[in-house]
Swiss-Prot record:
It comes from Pasteurella multocida (strain Pm70). Keywords: Chaperone, Cytoplasm. SUPFAM superfamilies: YgfY-like. It is found in: Cytoplasm. InterPro entries: SDH (IPR005631), SDH_sf (IPR036714), SdhE_FAD_assembly_factor (IPR050531). It comes from the Bacteria. Belongs to the SdhE FAD assembly factor family. This is FAD assembly factor SdhE. GO terms for cellular component: cytoplasm. Transmembrane segments: none annotated. One of its GO terms (biological process) is succinate metabolic process.
Length: 84
C-alpha cells in the first residue's frame, strides 16, 4: 500500500476557479480514500493539470488526451452526478 501525503493532495485540490473547487474538493474529501492505488495516482496526476484544462474536461468542452486522465474525469463526473 502506497503512502500518500494527504495534506499536500488537499492543498493541490485547491484551484483558482470556484467551479473546479466545487468539483475536485468534494470528490477528494468523500471518495479519495476508497480509490485503488492506481486511481489515486491518476487523481494526483490530474491535479497537476492546469485549471483551464480541468475546466474544459469537467464541463464537457474537451477531452483529455491521456486515457487514464479522461477515465478519472469521467469517474468523478459520474460519482458526483455531474452528467446525465
Amino acid at each position: 500500500m502506497t503512502q500518500y501525503n494527504k495534506l499536500r493532495i488537499e492543498w493541490d485540490c485547491r484551484r483558482g476557479m470556484l467551479e473546479l473547487d466545487n468539483v475536485i474538493m468534494p470528490f477528494y474529501r468523500q471518495h479519495f480514500d476508497a480509490l485503488s492505488d492506481t486511481q489515486k495516482d491518476t487523481f494526483i496526476r490530474l491535479l497537476a493539470c492546469s485549471d483551464l484544462q480541468l475546466f474544459s474536461w469537467f464541463f464537457n468542452r474537451g477531452m483529455a488526451t491521456d486515457p487514464q486522465l479522461q477515465q478519472m474525469v469521467d469517474y468523478i463526473q459520474k460519482t458526483l452526478k455531474l452528467t446525465d
